Amino acid sequence: MAKNTAIGIDLGTTYSCVGVFQHGKVEIIANDQGNRTTPSYVAFTDTERLIGDAAKNQVALNPQNTVFDAKRLIGRKFGDAVVQSDMKHWPFQVVNDGDKPKVQVNYKGESRSFFPEEISSMVLTKMKEIAEAYLGHPVTNAVITVPAYFNDSQRQATKDAGVIAGLNVLRIINEPTAAAIAYGLDRTGKGERNVLIFDLGGGTFDVSILTIDDGIFEVKATAGDTHLGGEDFDNRLVSHFVEEFKRKHKKDISQNKRAVRRLRTACERAKRTLSSSTQASLEIDSLFEGIDFYTSITRARFEELCSDLFRGTLEPVEKALRDAKMDKAQIHDLVLVGGSTRIPKVQKLLQDFFNGRDLNKSINPDEAVAYGAAVQAAILMGDKSENVQDLLLLDVAPLSLGLETAGGVMTALIKRNSTIPTKQTQTFTTYSDNQPGVLIQVYEGERAMTRDNNLLGRFELSGIPPAPRGVPQIEVTFDIDANGILNVTATDKSTGKANKITITNDKGRLSKEEIERMVQEAERYKAEDEVQRDRVAAKNALESYAFNMKSAVEDEGLKGKLSEADKKKVLDKCQEVISWLDSNTLADKEEFVHKREELERVCSPIISGLYQGAGAPGAGGFGAQAPPKGASGSGPTIEEVD
């Protein structure tokens, strides 16, 4: 496998890690300093550019020109609230370039600005070099991980960073998914297990629920916060000590970037110490205006400073359980990923939430993601080793996918959180007599009406042979592959004519915020949606009944059985209702129900003599404003044909 080795890179907010799968196992590769994780830092000086440990080590001397946290900027707009709030904490300068954030630094005596992708690509280049030094040959193929909540532009920008670093990015995979792969290889026991992965890193927090069964991984739900991690805990400590310095020495150090940076370094060290000891001391010589700052902090005080952040980690856990439709008792394993999960209070909160369940700490939390990425890279390169042979990875669709049926109703074929790859087929029919074609409009979203959802694409299937409404059978298939690319095909069963559209998830898809917003809106508007659904159902039921009555009395087979007077009475009333419908499409449910009862009072006595029952149910279909519905009036979906 020598030359076409593929590596797995965990590109973290604060630290990155690289692994390679060879000789049947994963090696996490140490850098030139002997560290298995490398700071995601890039520094620019008068003479050189430093990446990794070298950059982080000189940060106190050169804070304005040392860039970190590029992952917080990547794929975001300058005006983004997250970018604006983060800028307050950064010692380096972020400038606006056409609503794209750029980092401005002095390098070799001149001012330079870089896009976040460029900074991340420098970190990726460093990780690539670490792997090459270990393997002894060039490496180009890589799998790079991102938080589960990264939106499309953030994923695309991360991929771009890989390309800038000279990597062939085989795939971008979710960090929790990667951790699950690492975990899956460690656990080859049989039987289905539900695993909750709690990933609290330097900058992002992800909760994922996966089902692992005999080498098959299935992501059931993901939740999290793109802005919670170890750095936020450091910020709390920094603020605490800035206040303490003010109290003790009557001086404000917060505007002195170098002093704040030295304090932050000491705080990070103290935080790590507090994971194993109950007290940590800080000793910083000549922190500000020649004043030495010697102080200490207890674990209890640290927990108090961050208590809301720690407690807040349980909300995404609850949300993921809700989305996966699981009770906490159904989770078999709790897996900790990310350096911040070493904090005893975080472990205790999670353990208490799960009623004292043991936590799995068997995987080094800093390395699990890179480990899984390395395994995935080997799979994609076609590694034949038996350890990875039986491993299959399934992701989920973040939003429901469906099409518009008559009346603007959203009919979902693939439900939110369905496992991908997946394929769903449903049969639809026409809405009007001799309809020559149907327009297939593909939407994503959770709302009842398509106008509240996101249109992904549309196409037409024409050339349907003339036939009464409800007769043609049009089979629509939604097929999503492993990369999230959607193919929608429509086939007319009688002629075999087909048409299709391919929707890739490249550009302009919904961001995490929009997805969350749509789901929240869907919950908020559920009541409105119900009213609308009922209204459309009542309207469809009325229209269907009117058309059925009309066609029933016009049936040739009834000649002689039905007096002309009765026939005229029914037809006139039906025509009156149909005309009323045309001019009152926005009436409310009660009016439609009332009209239907009025029509039934005229028709039922006449028809019951001829038929037992009240006419055949109408067929549904695609169409203009109004879909017909079976006489049942049970809901807004179109009639499905078996």
From Swiss-Prot:
Entry-linked PANTHER family: HEAT SHOCK PROTEIN 70KDA
GO cellular component: cell body; centrosome; mitochondrial matrix; mitochondrion; zona pellucida receptor complex
The protein's name in its UniProt record: Heat shock 70 kDa protein 1B
Omega-N-methylarginine PTM positions: R469
Function text: Molecular chaperone implicated in a wide variety of cellular processes, including protection of the proteome from stress, folding and transport of newly synthesized polypeptides, activation of proteolysis of misfolded proteins and the formation and dissociation of protein complexes. Plays a pivotal role in the protein quality control system, ensuring the correct folding of proteins, the re-folding of misfolded proteins and controlling the targeting of proteins for subsequent degradation. This is achieved through cycles of ATP binding, ATP hydrolysis and ADP release, mediated by co-chaperones.
Keyword Transmembrane recorded: no
Domain notes: The N-terminal nucleotide binding domain (NBD) (also known as the ATPase domain) is responsible for binding and hydrolyzing ATP. The C-terminal substrate-binding domain (SBD) (also known as peptide-binding domain) binds to the client/substrate proteins. The two domains are allosterically coupled so that, when ATP is bound to the NBD, the SBD binds relatively weakly to clients. When ADP is bound in the NBD, a conformational change enhances the affinity of the SBD for client proteins.
Gene3D superfamilies named among the record's database cross-references: 1.20.1270.10, 3.30.30.30, 3.30.420.40, Actin, Chain A, domain 4 (3.90.640.10), Substrate Binding Domain Of DNAk, Chain A, domain 1 (2.60.34.10)
Cited InterPro entries: ATPase_NBD, Heat_shock_70_CS, HSP70_C_sf, HSP70_peptide-bd_sf, Hsp_70_fam
Origin species: Mus musculus
Segments for region (Nucleotide-binding domain (NBD)): 2-386
Posttranslational modification: In response to cellular stress, acetylated at Lys-77 by NA110 and then gradually deacetylated by HDAC4 at later stages. Acetylation enhances its chaperone activity and also determines whether it will function as a chaperone for protein refolding or degradation by controlling its binding to co-chaperones HOPX and STUB1. The acetylated form and the non-acetylated form bind to HOPX and STUB1 respectively. Acetylation also protects cells against various types of cellular stress.
Localization per record: Cytoplasm; Cytoplasm, Cytoskeleton, Microtubule organizing center, Centrosome
Entry keyword annotation includes Chaperone: yes
Modification type N6-acetyllysine: residues: K77, K108, K246, K348
Tissue: Testis-specific.
Record lineage: Eukaryota, Metazoa, Chordata, Craniata, Vertebrata
